[in-house]
Amino acid sequence: ANYLCYLLVFTLAYALTRRPWAAVAIGGLVAMTFGIANYFVVQFRGQPILPWDFQSFATAMTVSGGYEYVPTQKMAVSAMGYICTVVLCYKLSPHGLPAPPRSLRLAERFSALAVSVLLVVMLFPLNGLEGLGISVWAWNQKTSSERTGIAAGFFANVNFMLVEEPAGYSAGRV
């Protein structure tokens, strides 16, 4: 399920650019940035990045200045691997070929977008992650994300943000 979350990012990047090397560059950068940010958040706070953390992003940026960020050796190796992969994908991609017909370009974008929509429908409102055996251990998010994967755990937590209003609720009566 974790791979499906990453596939969503890569297919959206391909739908936007229609270039495999650009999709690898964008998708890899998003995944690597999220992973590094999550590493430091776990180091400082003891739990991973959660969807509702984005609501307090400004506060996090203010507080973040008080910490020291030292990249690990694994981060450096990952960054070098990412750069090498992007360069390799760029070098292997065809250059100087005549542009394919507009209909083919649109079909490629539409296909990538269709896969992205399918992944969104599968992962989000239909609780598709639960069907894949991904559940959130709400009281220990760090262990939960270690078991399920950070991306799948993050997206599984999105369901907790989609709260239905109770029957008979009135803001005036609160």
Predicted feature descriptions by range:
Residues 27-174:
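N-terminal secretory/membrane-targeting segments
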Residues 1-35:
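Membrane-anchoring hydrophobic segments
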